[in-house]
């Protein structure tokens, strides 16, 4: 029978070191609040029940933590009296009788499911408490994990450690798993007879051992256990998240010419054999199919780029942009809520908004779909194999038929039938010699102003 598990995520801190008007767990990593990354890691470890301990910005934190497939109940910690006290804020959830209780933190967004699963496996093998630790060459400031005969005998804080204990490089991450059937009893035994008068979760190690229980530790990569307390640490976490995800994508068959200059979001999807040139930013909701090419300095969010399509350089795809196979959106173009058909070309200096561009159509440089009248947005529909001349303005709502031609510089306000030629501009006039007169007049005005000065 599969073991049941409750994850208790501690997210009630005051976030004072973040110097922010909002809780630190709401700050984004890869376009997503860091608390959501933690819930995702918990879910990927097979845990579908979460007790979220909140304090500051409780409603916003609970909302940010919500992801599909995970049941979350929020519990308010009224006072900040230590980690042991924080876990007991979720007493009601713990009392429901889970096999495993996993305690983690909302400001550790790089954690993955491996150490979480390992901690649960330790419980399944008979431990009452399993602490997740990490090895580091910079152990100063961390509690050391002291192990004897395969069991964790203590977590020694640095100020209390001997010289030999300070030499230990296996450190406490703060994350741990607890036997769910004994959790409330163990937690209720934590005292606050210390300098700060707080209840420390780490005391569970000695409490469980004093009751004859087995306590063990499992290892996690140091970077996965990195917590976030300020903006500098947030930047470090973002960098490592990006490096890890880029590597995963490249190993899956995505080419990144200068990966350190490519920035991904938490949900970016890029298919095999896609090519990503330098200095590309993917906002949330970007899907790039196999074989697509994203040229340098492009920004893509909420958009889909099909196989064989080309974007950029210096292009922007906004939410709702959908490029069909073999289509092209070139330099200094922006597409928002626009569908670009198979083989269609939007090559330069163009805005396509709330529009459909049919297969094989060509949109000339400087074309604008005028989709907004200051109050409402309207749609432009361009048929297949149409040709839109440069510097044209298509004032929505308007439809351009299949195979139609729009003369350069036109302002189109009326539907154009299929295979028709439309011109919407003033007729050109030529007046011989008039340029000389205009020039002489301008020079005379300039001379008069100079004389007055």
Curated annotation (Swiss-Prot):
Binding site for Mg(2+): 107, 229
GO BP: any one term: regulation of cell shape
Primary site of residence: cytoplasm
Cell compartments where the protein resides: Cytoplasm
Region annotation N-acetyltransferase: where it falls in the sequence: 253-453
Keywords: Acyltransferase, Cell shape, Cell wall biogenesis/degradation, Cytoplasm, Magnesium, Metal-binding, Multifunctional enzyme, Nucleotidyltransferase, Peptidoglycan synthesis, Repeat, Transferase
GO molecular function: glucosamine-1-phosphate N-acetyltransferase activity; magnesium ion binding; UDP-N-acetylglucosamine diphosphorylase activity
PROSITE patterns: HEXAPEP_TRANSFERASES (PS00101)
Binding site for acetyl-CoA: 365, 371-372, 390, 408, 425
First-tier enzyme category under EC: transferase
Record bears the keyword Transferase: yes
EC number: 2.7.7.23, 2.3.1.157
Active-site positions on this chain: 348 (proton acceptor)
Cofactor(s) of this protein: Mg(2+)
InterPro entries: Bifunctional_GlmU (IPR005882), GlmU-like (IPR050065), GlmU_C_LbH (IPR038009), Hexapep (IPR001451), Hexapep_transf_CS (IPR018357), MobA-like_NTP_Trfase (IPR025877), Nucleotide-diphossugar_trans (IPR029044), Trimer_LpxA-like_sf (IPR011004)
Binding residue positions for UDP-N-acetyl-alpha-D-glucosamine: 10-13, 24, 77, 82-83, 105-107, 143, 157, 172, 229, 318, 336, 351, 362
Region (Linker): 232-252
SUPFAM superfamilies registered for this protein in UniProt: Nucleotide-diphospho-sugar transferases, Trimeric LpxA-like enzymes
Keyword Metal-binding belongs to the record: yes
Cofactor binding annotation: Binds 1 Mg(2+) ion per subunit.
Lineage top rank: taxon: Bacteria
Quaternary structure and interacting proteins, as annotated: Homotrimer.
HAMAP family hit by this protein: GlmU (MF_01631)
Official protein name in the record: Bifunctional protein GlmU
Organism: Rhizobium etli (strain ATCC 51251 / DSM 11541 / JCM 21823 / NBRC 15573 / CFN 42)
């Amino acid at each position: 029978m599969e073991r049941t598990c409750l994850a208790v995520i501690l997210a009630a801190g005051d976030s004072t070191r973040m110097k922010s008007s909002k809780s630190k767990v709401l700050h984004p990593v890869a376009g997503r609040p860091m608390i959501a990354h933690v819930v995702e890691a918990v879910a990927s470890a097979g845990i579908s029940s979460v007790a979220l301990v909140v304090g500051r910005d409780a409603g916003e934190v609970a909302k940010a933590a919500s992801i599909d497939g995970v049941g979350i109940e929020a519990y308010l910690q009224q006072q900040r009296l230590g980690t042991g006290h924080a876990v007991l804020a979720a007493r009601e959830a713990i009392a429901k009788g889970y096999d495993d209780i996993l305690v983690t933190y909302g400001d550790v967004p790089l954690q993955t499911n491996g150490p979480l699963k390992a901690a649960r496996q330790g419980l399944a093998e008979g431990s009452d408490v399993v602490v997740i630790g990490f090895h580091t060459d910079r152990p100063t400031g961390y509690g050391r994990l002291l192990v004897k005969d395969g069991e964790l005998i203590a977590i020694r804080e640095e100020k209390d450690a001997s010289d030999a204990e300070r030499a230990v490089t296996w450190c406490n991450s703060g994350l741990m798993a607890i036997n769910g059937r004994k959790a409330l009893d163990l937690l209720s035994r934590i005292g606050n007879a210390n300098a700060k008068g707080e209840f420390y979760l780490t005391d569970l190690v000695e409490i469980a051992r004093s009751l004859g229980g087995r306590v063990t530790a499992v290892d996690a990569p140091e970077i996965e256990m990195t917590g976030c307390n300020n903006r500098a640490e947030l930047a470090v976490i973002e960098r490592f998240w990006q490096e890890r995800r880029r590597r995963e994508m490249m190993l899956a068959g995505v080419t990144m010419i200068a990966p350190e200059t490519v920035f991904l979001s938490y949900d970016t999807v890029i298919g095999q054999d896609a090519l990503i040139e330098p200095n590309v930013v993917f906002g949330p909701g970007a899907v790039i199919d196999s074989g697509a090419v994203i040229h340098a300095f492009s920004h893509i969010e909420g958009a889909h780029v099909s196989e064989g399509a080309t974007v950029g350089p210096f292009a922007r795809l906004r939410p709702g942009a959908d490029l069909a196979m073999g289509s092209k959106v070139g330099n200094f173009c922006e597409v928002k809520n626009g569908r670009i058909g198979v083989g269609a070309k939007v090559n330069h200096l163009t805005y396509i908004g709330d529009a459909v561009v049919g297969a094989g159509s060509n949109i000339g440089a400087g074309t604008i779909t005028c989709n907004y009248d200051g109050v409402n947005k309207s749609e432009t529909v361009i048929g297949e194999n149409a040709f839109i001349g440069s510097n044209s303005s298509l004032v929505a709502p308007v439809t351009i038929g299949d195979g139609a031609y729009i003369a350069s510089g036109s302002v189109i306000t009326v539907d154009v039938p299929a295979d028709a030629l439309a011109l919407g501009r003033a007729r050109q006039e030529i007046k011989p010699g008039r340029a000389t007169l205009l020039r002489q007049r301008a020079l005379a005005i300039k001379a008069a102003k100079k004389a007055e000065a």
